[in-house]
Amino acid sequence: MKTKFVAVILGMALLGASSVACAQFGGLGSKLSGVTGGSSSNVSPEGIVTKYVGGAQNVNKADVKMLRAVGLKEEADRAELQAKNLTEGATQGSLEDATKVQTDSSKALQEKFASGKVEMDEKSKKQFADGMVDLAHGLLAYVGMSKEASGFKPAPTAIGSSSLSAAYVVKTLPDSIKSLGSTLKSSIDFAKTNNIPVPKEAADATSAI
């Protein structure tokens, strides 16, 4: 009888130890799963769109200031209107419009730089320099979120507006960074040629490209 009692006690002890071990390894499995899954498990489509819009707003502000500074008022007005229309809950269509305006603004600026026909007073030079700071901030925002965005993989069943917008951001972000980087470098060259002090933020941002 005593032997049976001891056997029961030992069996219960082993069962308890087994349960603890399973719980511990189960927790470890969850942790490993989180690691191997990367940051994508913590990335929401809404978060990606919100961060992208924040960067895009800086780029739009930069475009408005720099375009006006070099006398491109019509293009500046277009960029300003786009800035007002772009919100945190932007749809894919809104983001496509924003990308087009940014591309058109960059093209207009670079063509103006190349023309050599730019007259600027001290006020416009300061406005141009301020725009370079905004452009640097926008570019760094894009670069900063690029790694996070690259880890985003929408679920196969995700058909919501935010998921479509986030997928668009992931697809176009590398080209946007490349385009803005080129515009910033051209702006720095233009500033140096026209005796416009180059802001530290602009110079530093080029190293992040």
Tell me the role of every PLM-derived stretch:
Residues 24-92, 96, 205-209:
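Immediate post-signal-peptide N-terminus of mature secreted/exported proteins
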